[in-house]
Structures are given as structure tokens and as C-alpha cells.
């Protein structure tokens, strides 16, 4: 999912694409095996029977690929989380280095930083954020333009979706740190922002404190909670750094069995 050399998110493949690729590969092997079995049909009729091979093909696709968690239907929220699941394609979860599991700035608005299973799949099985959308195979997140005005700055209502590549060279401010005066105008107070890295580095962005008016020409998030998954957004005060509380809450929501009348 993430290319650590450039901090770019790689192209996102849909479940249907992965399934089609696995099915085509399995069918090719099945045809070869079945054709060879036909030659020994008279000696052993079971050797050419397609049903055992079809069963083996199906088991390989469902159990040895990335579809093992394709049917989490404990409750409605578990289904929603499953629909928004994003898996990192890797050969083995047990041998994947820790560098592939870490959070990165390009994840903002695309991958929820909290909703990931513990254990070997930590950081490899993730959940798409609320505002994230797959456009041309890339995970994009919505922003709003910041414009310079006579009173300082104002935020446009127009939504612009950007991929990680589109973000290069632009400034992005934290909308929660912007403050307004009594007249409803934004004040030139310090804010937290993601700005281009002035030094030559593999990381294209750094997090810094800048004046609000310096954000003119840049962008802010379309919604304060767009970096959270739909399930994580239900946790009260999820914007704080209490990771354990949020993780436990997510597990409880997904595993709850609701009572019926």
C-alpha cells in the first residue's frame, strides 16, 4: 500500500480485481491438471474428476489469499468496517518488517490511524477513512481551498479531492487550530500545518507551526474527523491521543451482538 522510498501510496486494487486475478491463475493451473488427468481416465476415473480440483482451487483462493476476512457480519458496524477494509499485499504477515506497519503523513484522510488489528496483522490490515475515495486506483481525500481576503483568509466551500501526488508542494492546515474573532473572521494565530519539507529528504512533508494567514493558497481538511474510520468516528473524543481507549472501543463495537425485541 505504501512505498516507503517516496512516501507515496501505491495503487489501490479492489477486491474484485484481486479475486479475478486469483481465479484466472487457479483456472489456468486447473486446466493443465485436468487435461493431464484425462489421459489416465480409463485407469483411474477419479483422477480426472473436476470436483476435487475445483474444491482445492476454491480453498486456495479463499484461505491462502487476502479474502480470509471477507465476510465479517457480526453486526452492522462490523459489516461497514469490512467494506472499508484496506489490506497491504505482502507475502507473509509474520516476516513483514516494522517499517511497513508504521503510520505516515500520507495516511492522513486516507487510512484510519486507530482501526487496525493487533498481533501479526498490525498495520497491514487497515481501514479506509470516512472521506477517502478511490479515484483512478489511488486513495484520495477531500480538502477545501484557503483564500486571501481583505479581512485575512477565508475557506472555500468547494471540495477538492487529492491523491498523495497532488499534495506535493502544497500547504495543509489543521482546521481545528484556526480561531475566529467576534466578527467571525479568522485571526492570524499560530496553527499546526503540514508543509513541504525545505530539506532534501525522502519525506516530502513536515509538521510545523505557522501563522494562519500564511496558509493562504493552501488547504484545510474538508471535515475535522475525516481522518477517522466510520467506526472510530463513533468513539467520543477520538481526536485525542488515547489510542488504547479508542482501540478497545472499536473492538467492542465490531464484536457486539445487539439484542432484538
Regions found by a protein language model. Give the residues of each.
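Long, charge-dense accessory insertions within large macromolecular proteins
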Residues: 3-115, 125, 138-261
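Covalent nucleotidyltransferase core used to form phosphodiester bonds in nucleic acids
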Residues: 132-138
